[in-house]
Swiss-Prot record:
<feature type="binding site">
    <location>
        <position position="146"/>
    </location>
    <ligand>
        <name>IMP</name>
    </ligand>
</feature>
<keyword id="KW-0378">Hydrolase</keyword>
<keyword id="KW-0460">Magnesium</keyword>
<dbReference type="GO" id="GO:0009117">
    <property type="term" value="P:nucleotide metabolic process"/>
</dbReference>
<feature type="binding site">
    <location>
        <position position="106"/>
    </location>
    <ligand>
        <name>ATP</name>
    </ligand>
</feature>
<protein>
    <recommendedName>
        <fullName>IMP-specific 5'-nucleotidase 1</fullName>
        <ecNumber>3.1.3.99</ecNumber>
    </recommendedName>
</protein>
<feature type="binding site">
    <location>
        <position position="348"/>
    </location>
    <ligand>
        <name>IMP</name>
    </ligand>
</feature>
<feature type="binding site">
    <location>
        <position position="154"/>
    </location>
    <ligand>
        <name>IMP</name>
    </ligand>
</feature>
<keyword id="KW-0067">ATP-binding</keyword>
<keyword id="KW-0479">Metal-binding</keyword>
<feature type="binding site">
    <location>
        <position position="356"/>
    </location>
    <ligand>
        <name>IMP</name>
    </ligand>
</feature>
<dbReference type="GO" id="GO:0050483">
    <property type="term" value="F:IMP 5'-nucleotidase activity"/>
</dbReference>
<dbReference type="GO" id="GO:0071590">
    <property type="term" value="P:nicotinamide riboside biosynthetic process"/>
</dbReference>
<keyword id="KW-0547">Nucleotide-binding</keyword>
<feature type="binding site">
    <location>
        <position position="383"/>
    </location>
    <ligand>
        <name>Mg(2+)</name>
    </ligand>
</feature>
<keyword id="KW-0546">Nucleotide metabolism</keyword>
<dbReference type="GO" id="GO:0006190">
    <property type="term" value="P:inosine salvage"/>
</dbReference>
Amino acid sequence: MSSRYRVEYNLKVHKKDAFIEWIKGLLAVPFVLQAGTDSGAERTYKQYCSIFSDIENLVSQKIEIQNRRRQLGSLEEARLDQLVPQVGTFFTHLPLVEAFEVQNRRRAICSRKMVSPSFNDIRHILNSAQILALLKSKELKLVTFDGDVTLYEDGGSIERGGKIVTRIITLLKRGINVGVVTAAGYDDPDKYKERLYGLCFALFSDKSMSLEQKSKLTVMGGESNYLFQYFETSEQFGFKSIDDDEWVPSSVKAWSDDDIDATLDVAQTCFGELSHLLALPSKCQIIRKKRAVGFVPGFIFDDELEVNVKIKIPREALEEMVLVVQKKLESYPPAQNIQFSCFDGGSDVWCDIGGKDLGVSILQNFYQTDSPITAAQTLHIGDQFAPKGSANDFKARSAGCTLWISSPRETIEVLDDLLPYL
């Protein structure tokens, strides 16, 4: 296996994004022409800045046209939409030149002679630009997080003393609403207390914070199906369920149970058929919940180690299952009457009713019922932003600003960029 193959394939962890790939192509030209020359780094820096300045202007133009289309019904098309048809909605201007300068100091992008600006370089630049934009606006009111691979490792939890704990508490102390929008779907609030125990314990132990500040922490479980809010008494702490009448939108209340059950039935049948077709181990299981169905790895006995070990489902099989189920449901009439989300969780596959766009939107309304928090005042941090199919954070792009991270360590890094200036 060649090194290039390994590098390109490993990028599938973040699934290629059309906007990032387009920027990557623009930056490749000055890199090829200038790298290795006597004045290469300086000239490359100037050309990169010029490119990012042009992209900045294209984003600003797109926002202006978005506003005209919304307010005046204009049919005008932005130049950026013509160049990158898959590009989504922008809610803030992006200071890309300033963000590039930040990341160039950290990653020495212009000093490299053999490796051109990569997918991850550009991802970090876009993250920095979004942070800078929110800081300049001074309007950030809601920060939402994915769970696995964002706040903690896949299948893990927030431990006592974890680095992420102090960062989230700082957000709460500064009056920012914080929501954990996770695919983990439990109707029992104690399950979320277990996953977020280190954070809950720290909140309970912090006597300098008011209960009002602490109650700004919520959990949206099953992407958009269960809402819980932090609470404490003199002896207890954890999460309490919020009554459906206080947060479930009327549009969601209109979904019929028959359509929901039929959609999950089809997904469940597909998982079963694909399990046989892809020759996956019989120990793998299909789990059916009230508003979700998943295909998860089981355990198999390792004769050499003499212990049960978790089955590893091949990445290709996970992606195949997601895309097949997604395509099947897109043409299934009952599924068109509701919202659903199919995604690859890294070691398993799920089909949920609802989606993270809906989950974030619900929190925007829950925190400010009379005047909902806007997309430009919202920041969602997650690790799954693939443009289609296998990533559930992607939908959150339509509900607010986003940061694309790849690990809990990166979550801490972006919060460290944000918090000192809030």
